Each structure stands twice: as C-alpha cells, then as structure tokens.
C-alpha cells in the first residue's frame, strides 16, 4: 500500500525592522583608551497569513509574542591601558506575550491589568501573560604578561569574566521549564564566572 501526498505551503510570514550599530572611540586617553559599541534591532512588524482552501484567510500576529520582542540589543564599553583591559556590557530583551492564554472575563474582572496583553489573532482577541523586559550585565578584566615577565607567564594573557553579573533569574513563563530557554537561556545558570588563559609561542 502506498500513498502519494502533495504538500502545499499555505502560510506566508512577514517581518520588517531595522538593525542599528554604533562604534565610537573616545578621543581622550589620559586614563586609558575607551571604546563604546552598541548593536540593536527594532522589529516594526511581524505577522503570518494563512490561506486555507475553502476558508477565509487568517491573520496571525507575531509581534511581541513567543519571544519576538520589539527591541533587543547590547551596549558595552571597553577599556585598555598598557597591559590591562576591561569591559562592561548590558544586554536588553524587550517584553513579549506568553503563548498561554486566559479568558476575556478574567481579563475584565482583573481590571484589564498591564501584565496581560490583548492581541488580535486569527479573527479573535487573545489574552496573554506579558513576560517583562530584562537587562543582564557581563563584565571582564584581563592582563597581558610581556616578554620581560617571569618565564612561567611570559607572553600569556589572563582574562577573568562574569556572565549575568547581577545574578538575575529568567522571567517566568508558562512552559514546562518555567522560563523560555530560547530567549532567556543564558540567565538560567545564574551568575557564571569564566577564566581564560592563552599564550603566544
């Protein structure tokens, strides 16, 4: 027994936005050389359109749902003076609506709170919990041993870093894990220290 099935693509996705980047070298260097860098993305529109044969087209809103935030980006400053280096950066993830929904009656009885988003999706309004915006910080400090240093550390770079400096927990979501691993996965381990050693031969 065999069966031949012809698949059809019945949905179209649309997304538009802007990517912004900035790199600036601060001109004065009395305390060392400072550099500023920023990379941000702005999502203007994001939706999906489904056209099922024999049925009316469906408009599915993807803006600020399931991790599709309007704003996302990072800004950081680095410093260098002699053999020393250091840096601090912040990573921002905007708010978005969770996939789980509640009823219009619950939304109304609660006084239409801001932590529930009212979104039009597939011809009806859905009421979703809002996962709040979050900012995490990373930092590092490093030192480069020169050719005149002790032979054990000569031409060696040492770098100590920390991820999620303030030890923030990932925001709560309705998924099985209680958070969104695709969006806030780096926050789950908490504050994480790193040590990097490299040597030039």
Give a label for each model feature.
Residues 36-150:
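C-terminal beta-barrel architecture of Gram-negative outer-membrane proteins
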Residues 11-13, 27-36, 49-50, 146-156:
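Short loop/turn motifs that connect adjacent beta-strands in outer-membrane beta-barrel proteins
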Residues 14-18, 69-73, 133-137, 154, ...:
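Residues that define the transmembrane beta-barrel architecture of outer-membrane proteins
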Residues 44, 89-111, 143-201:
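C-terminal beta-signal and adjacent terminal beta-strands/loops
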Residues 5-6, 123-125, 181:
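Short structured motifs
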Residues 7, 17-21, 35, 72-76, ...:
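Membrane-embedded beta-strand positions in outer-membrane beta-barrel channels/transporters
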Residues 1-16, 63-64:
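Surface-exposed, low-complexity loop segments enriched in small/polar and acidic residues
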